[in-house]
Amino acid sequence: LRRQRQMCIRDSNDEIISTGYNGAPRGRINCTDAGRCARVEMKIPSGERYELCRSVHAEANAIISASRRDMIGSTLYLVGRDAQTHELLTNATSCSMCRRQVINAGIERVIIRTGDDTFNIVDVDEWVKNDDSAFWIE
């Protein structure tokens, strides 16, 4: 496990409607508990080949646990830490698969902690407009 991510989704009334974390599917062992990561062992660069990762991302875990009705117009808060050092990741962001899930869930903004007192605020409409999966469309 390379990174640990925790997040929550809050509705427009500022109530937490769901939380999530990176971890193996229910009933399966986590990489941190097993003491090994297949993607690290295969020397796969960070940010690539997520389909080979056994964990479910924090965003997906939170979205799975919430109703879409509650998520429409909501805010997702994300913080990432290095799995070994537990240091705050200053460049944390959602991967392209999680971005698609956030878009379809109806979440309006994503607030990512980038430092002790700093945050990156993302308007999800920007992810829609700047489609990182449309590299093949002219």
Segments the model singles out, each with a brief description of its role:
Residues D11-I17:
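Short, glycine-anchored, charge-dense loop/turn motifs used at functional sites
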Residues S18-E138:
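Zn2+-dependent cytidine deaminase-like catalytic core
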Residues L1-I9:
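Single conserved hydrophobic/aromatic residue that forms the stacking wall/gate
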